[in-house]
Regions:
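Short recognition helix of helix-turn-helix/winged-helix DNA-binding domains
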Residues: 1-60
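Winged helix-turn-helix DNA-binding recognition segment
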Residues: 37-97
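Short, amphipathic alpha-helical interaction segments positioned at domain boundaries
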Residues: 102-107
Length: 107
């Protein structure tokens, strides 16, 4: 993952109307993904991780957020079901695609 220290995300005020807003784990998970998504395409071990995507392992994600593995799996499944993320499983993790990344990180 490449995070540019001086980059930022735009968080619209209507985020408080988001269906998962009152679930602290979901908010923390989604904000973690937003803040750690690539701001430009990057090659990593012959895999291109595009803008709006982040490479994570569930174990690392659990350590970083303090959310249990089971709650992470549930949260990711919910975000996928509501079409807010897509993900591709890899041998050592997964690439999470934030579907509306452009809304939060304008060019």
């Amino acid at each position: 993952m490449n995070i540019v220290d001086n980059s930022w995300i735009k968080l619209p005020r209507n985020f408080v109307n988001w269906s998962w807003y009152h679930d602290a784990n979901m908010v923390q998970l989604y904000l973690y993904l937003l803040l750690n998504a690539n701001v430009y395409d990057v090659k990593y071990n012959d895999i291109t991780i595009k803008r709006g995507e982040c490479l994570v392992s569930l174990n690392h994600l659990s350590k970083e957020t303090g959310i249990s593995l089971q709650k992470l799996r549930t949260g990711l499944a919910r975000l996928q079901r509501t079409k807010e993320i897509e993900y591709k499983k890899l041998q050592n993790g997964r690439i999470i695609v934030l579907v509306d990344f452009k809304k939060f990180q304008p060019i």
